[in-house]
């Protein structure tokens, strides 16, 4: 027969909860603390994610989901109305100014419709976008500053820029402007479509021009499905219209782009088991941390109220009903604890986020208010609460009325009696007491150990960030000076006008403090190598369609052996620069010999420094023939007519560049190397070889310095930084510089961010550990009040009792220290091996400093906490304590 007694059970639970006000306060605080942990971490994570996305969008140049590049007008009209597309925007690139004052800024002149302008952060704060049929233009305050024009509507400005190799000078009327954002790589001058077409007609460029992009249609889109699977949707749109983006040589190929700024797109494209495991492990860690404290709170409650639950059995209460009482109390307390934790967690996360983001260069500071934060934190906290009260509920449900009245913690455990010659000591009693409730002891020791392990992992993680490895990836020497265009993305190919004069080097050297330095000579002449057709195709397949490739091979000259002529990249390096190369195979010693006919073949590497051994054809010991071209003629293969320059070839004709006057020089490949990005050309597309600097000048007859790299003393670093900043800004703005100090600052900011995040998490987990330690001691003393009273009644001194409790506390601390040390030593190398695969600049260095600092703190807690708890419990007399239990 089923009795409807739910109302009675709820009343019992409510009244017993009202009688335990202290317990309620502790439980609410425990639940709130767990919710704070979830909410603050979710807030920080979501805020940093949003900030990273905004930062990434600015680096990408916009926040559209993806796009289709270099389209014909027909392809554009075909794709833009696909059902998967929610909104679309169109842009046509026209040209770029590269001369002073734009040599240090990336400025693009183009047409963009309203959607595209908005997605590129080109929303005028004053005025509007340009109207068709006018000479209007809109731009940002940085471009206006470079032009020396005040941001006033109606202002006229004139600018010269390159359009597909042709320089044009145009005058515009300012119709709108927006504030300059230094995080955005490219600045824009937006003009009407009619003016863009007129400029293309003026210079004689037919889209897509010689460069394959000028005047072509670029379609950017916002997808109906959002950012969850951008790449798949882009591919599906192409498939819907008979195109693809995988085989660059195929006639149906269209170049596409996925906005990597969306973390959802990154996860969908790069999701691997290690990422899933890492996220799951972090969530489980947080749940377990919250579980430890809430579980102990309810365990204390059940221990204190054990007689109450036993007596409920005498009036017919079932174990399931008693579990429901505890669960009801937990849910009621959650109604107070979870909202409090949500508010406090969001406020704490909101305060921590700016501190963390301030360490991250370029990340937009913002505090997320996403509903995901609050819903997720509330659900995780609720699950943690329900898990935490299950075992205490089972304990209450299992106890019988007689057992409840006689209950002493651990009293139900039966063990074999050991006979020994030694007497009982306070230490042995303390050890035995810990064994009476092994589950509680394990939970407490684990909780304390978790804090130590987490702190040690955090310190080892941030300590493993190798500044030398990070900085050397971007800057090989303390300072590197070059023409400003050499540091610009999309800048000019190195030429004679970009060379560093000796006078500039002399001015730098005159500052003093330079310990060593050297130059890298750049190629300003025509030079060819001859390669097989297979390598020619492999090296260029990403840039041409199959039809274009076949035509290119038809128009490419061959030598007597039938090998194809191909552009080659050469540089001459002094000893200082050669010292900074990474040797993959062979020996660089022969390149230190002036005049030696030896070269190093340059191989590409990935972000982790792993060489890509298929990025070059040359192998150790190969003979490379370099053809230094002094005079070239341009022959129409169909008519055989030769022209002196490409400009002389009729627009409707093809031509083959054929060397007329040249020198062939043979070199032996002495080494295979990787070049630091800071000393490289910073653009690719041709096989590259490095020569000795004197050999380079002797064989090429040129001496244009591309880079001057040098190191300084620590004392002179600051002065040199200040000098170069002023020199390149005010004295000689044609040149610019990079320094290790800049990248070191970025590195320290990133490391500080991880230290702050890890430190905050370690503090919260450590606080939970200390609270659990306090709870464990409190539970043990409360549950054994009668036992202590009996011991004192038969002659045990209060001092002895306190000593025994101190021993218990020290054993907890010792156990936590031992377990944390073992876990760190066992799992540290394994975990950090995985970290090293994620962060290419990570080098594992074990340090136990956190352990050595925290261990004495735990020992001190092991002494103070038991004494403090015992002092509050022992205020009653022995007789009162005996009567209280009986």
Feature roles, as predicted:
Residues 20, 292-333, 769-811:
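Interfacial "coupling" helices/loops that link adjacent transmembrane helices in transporter permeases
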Residues 269-286, 372, 748-765:
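N-terminal membrane-entry
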Residues 48, 271, 338, 342-376, ...:
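Short helix-loop junctions at transmembrane helix boundaries
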Residues 3, 10-18, 24-30, 40-66, ...:
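Cytosol-facing boundaries of transmembrane alpha helices in integral membrane proteins
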Residues 1-26, 300-321, 348-374, 383-455, ...:
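Feature of multi-pass inner-membrane transport and sensor proteins
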Residues 46-266, 463, 470-758:
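Basic-flanked hydrophobic alpha-helices used for secretion and membrane insertion
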Residues 32-39, 43, 290, 330, ...:
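Small-residue faces within membrane-embedded alpha-helices
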Residues 754-768, 779, 788, 822, ...:
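Hydrophobic multi-pass inner-membrane translocation pores used for secretion
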């Amino acid at each position: 027969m089923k009795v409807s007694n739910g109302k009675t059970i709820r009343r019992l639970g409510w009244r017993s909860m009202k009688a335990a006000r202290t317990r309620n306060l502790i439980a609410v605080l425990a639940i709130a603390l767990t919710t704070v942990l979830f909410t603050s971490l979710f807030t920080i994570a979501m805020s940093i994610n949003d900030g990273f996305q905004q930062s990434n969008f600015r680096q990408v140049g916009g926040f559209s989901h993806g796009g289709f590049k270099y389209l014909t007008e027909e392809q554009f009209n075909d794709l833009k109305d696909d059902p998967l597309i929610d909104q679309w925007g169109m842009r046509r690139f026209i040209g770029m100014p590269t001369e002073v004052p734009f040599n240090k800024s990336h400025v693009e002149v183009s047409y963009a419709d309203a959607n595209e302008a908005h997605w590129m952060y080109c929303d005028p704060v004053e005025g509007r976008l340009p109207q068709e049929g006018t000479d209007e233009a809109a731009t940002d305050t940085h471009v206006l500053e470079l032009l020396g024009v005040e941001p006033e509507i109606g202002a006229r400005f004139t600018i010269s820029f390159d359009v597909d190799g042709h320089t044009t000078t145009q005058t515009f009327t300012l119709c709108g402007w927006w504030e300059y954002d230094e995080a955005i790589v490219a600045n824009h001058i937006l003009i009407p479509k009619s003016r863009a077409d007129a400029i293309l007609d003026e210079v004689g460029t037919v889209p897509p021009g010689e460069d394959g992009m000028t005047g072509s249609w670029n379609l950017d889109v916002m997808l109906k499905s959002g950012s969850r699977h951008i790449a798949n949707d882009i591919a599906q749109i192409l498939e819907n219209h008979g195109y693809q983006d995988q085989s660059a040589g195929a006639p149906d190929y269209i170049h596409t782009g996925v906005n990597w700024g969306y973390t959802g797109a990154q996860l969908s494209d790069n999701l691997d088991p290690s990422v899933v495991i890492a996220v799951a492990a972090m969530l489980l860690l947080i749940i377990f941390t919250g579980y430890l404290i809430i579980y102990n709170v309810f365990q204390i409650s059940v221990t204190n109220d054990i007689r109450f639950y036993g007596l409920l059995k005498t009036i017919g209460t079932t174990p399931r009903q008693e579990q429901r009482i505890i669960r009801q109390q937990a849910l009621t307390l959650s109604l107070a604890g979870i909202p409090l934790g949500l508010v406090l967690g969001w406020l704490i996360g909101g305060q921590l986020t700016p501190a963390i983001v301030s360490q991250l260069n370029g990340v937009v500071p913002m505090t997320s208010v996403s509903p995901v934060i609050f819903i997720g934190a509330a659900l995780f906290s609720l699950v943690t609460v329900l898990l935490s009260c299950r075992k205490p509920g089972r304990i209450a449900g299992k106890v019988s009325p007689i057992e409840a009245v006689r209950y002493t913690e651990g009293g139900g455990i039966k063990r074999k009696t050991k006979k020994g010659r030694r007497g009982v000591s306070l230490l042995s009693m303390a050890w035995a007491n810990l064994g009476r409730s092994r589950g509680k002891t394990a939970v407490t020791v684990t909780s304390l150990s978790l804090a130590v392990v987490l702190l040690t992992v955090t310190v080892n993680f941030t300590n493993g960030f190798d500044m030398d490895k990070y900085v050397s990836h971007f800057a090989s020497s303390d300072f590197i000076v070059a023409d400003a265009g050499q540091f610009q993305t999309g800048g000019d190919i190195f030429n004679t006008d970009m060379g560093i004069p000796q006078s500039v080097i002399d001015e730098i050297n005159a500052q003093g403090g330079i310990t060593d330095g050297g130059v890298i000579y750049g190629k300003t002449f025509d030079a060819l190598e001859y390669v097989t057709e297979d390598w020619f195709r492999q090296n260029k397949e990403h840039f041409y369609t199959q039809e274009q490739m076949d035509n290119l091979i038809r128009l490419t000259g061959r030598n007597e052996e039938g090998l194809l002529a191909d552009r080659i990249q050469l540089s001459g390096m002094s000893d200082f620069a050669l010292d900074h190369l990474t040797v993959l195979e062979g020996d660089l010693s022969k390149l230190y010999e002036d005049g030696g006919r030896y070269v190093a073949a340059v191989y590409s590497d990935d972000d982790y420094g792993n060489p890509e051994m298929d990025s070059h054809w040359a192998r150790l010991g190969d003979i490379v023939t370099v053809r230094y071209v002094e005079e070239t003629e341009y022959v129409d293969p169909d008519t055989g007519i030769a022209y002196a320059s490409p400009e002389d070839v009729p627009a409707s004709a093809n031509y083959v560049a054929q060397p007329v006057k040249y020198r062939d020089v043979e070199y032996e490949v002495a080494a295979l190397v990787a070049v630091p990005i800071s000393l490289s050309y910073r653009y690719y597309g041709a096989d590259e070889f490095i020569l000795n600097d004197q050999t380079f000048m002797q064989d090429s007859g040129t001496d244009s310095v591309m880079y001057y790299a040098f190191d300084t003393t620590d004392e002179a670093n600051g002065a040199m930084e200040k000098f170069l900043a002023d020199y390149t800004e005010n004295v000689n703005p044609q040149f610019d510089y990079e320094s290790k100090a800049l990248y070191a600052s970025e590195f320290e900011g990133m490391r500080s961010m991880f230290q702050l995040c890890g430190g905050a998490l370690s503090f919260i987990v450590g606080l939970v550990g200390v609270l659990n330690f306090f709870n464990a001691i409190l539970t043990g003393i409360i549950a054994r009040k009668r036992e202590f009273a009996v011991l004192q009644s038969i002659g045990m001194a209060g001092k002895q009792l306190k000593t025994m409790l101190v021993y218990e506390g020290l054993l907890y601390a010792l156990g936590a220290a031992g377990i944390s040390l073992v876990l760190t030593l066992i799992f540290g190398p394994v975990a950090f091996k995985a970290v090293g695969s994620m962060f290419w600049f990570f080098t594992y260095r074990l340090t136990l400093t956190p352990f050595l600092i925290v261990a004495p703190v735990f020992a001190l807690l092991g002494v103070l906490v038991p004494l403090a708890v015992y002092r509050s419990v022992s205020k009653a007399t022995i007789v009162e304590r005996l009567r209280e239990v009986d």
